[in-house]
Amino acid sequence: MASLSGPISPTNLEMFKPGVEELNPSKLLLLSNHQEGMLYPTILGSLELLSFKKERSLNLQRDKVCLLHQESQLLKLRGTGTDTTDVLLKQPMATSVNCCHDGIFTILEQDRMPKTSMAPILTESSGSLVTRLMSIPRLTFSIGTQVAMRLFRLGFRLARYSLRVTILKAQEGLLLIPDLLHAHPVEPLVQDRVVEPILATEPLPLV
């Protein structure tokens, strides 16, 4: 071994690093720590550098295919002393099943949102619609009856003739309703009822 009393020459320095590879700026990779502002130099060999680049490109391609699941706020608070109940942890723990070994979250199948049943609303609206439709003929017949009685009392010849034609057409329609129901089925509300022809009990006044 050379003496260390004098100045150290470059040839003597080579004796102290027989297996150390010369530093190359292209092989010096700075990896950022989780804490901001902390950088650590890491020396990688040529094979390790290639494998790192290949693994990084595969991870980037996988990120494009698989959607990243956002980490829940409760998962961030785990291990920090924050009190979390089992009820609040059910949903985050259920999503942890989709986590791969490399830490990438993949969404396999999203739980379907519970749909509110619209049956009561539809039933209520249809019931109110049927009630209104059934009240319209009654109102129309009551108004028509009052108008017809006033016209007959006044003795207007043209008005009485028009009313007579209208009443005869209505009676004809009532007689044809059973045949029309068999040929053209309608809603069950009308089918359940037995439609009977309504005959005039009193003869209509002649014009």
Curated annotation (Swiss-Prot):
CDD domains assigned: embe-CoV_Protein-I_like
Keyword match Ion transport: no
Location(s) in or outside the cell: Virion
GO CC terms of this entry: virion component
Pfam families tied to this protein: Corona_I
Keywords of the record: Virion
Cited InterPro entries: Corona_nucI, N2-like_embe-CoV
Family note: Belongs to the coronavirus I protein family.
Lineage of producing organism: Viruses, Riboviria, Orthornavirae, Pisuviricota, Pisoniviricetes
Described purpose of this protein according to its UniProt entry: Structural protein that is not essential for the viral replication either in tissue culture or in its natural host.
Name recorded for this polypeptide: Protein I
Gene that produces this protein: N
Additional note from the record: The gene encoding this protein is included within the N gene (alternative ORF).
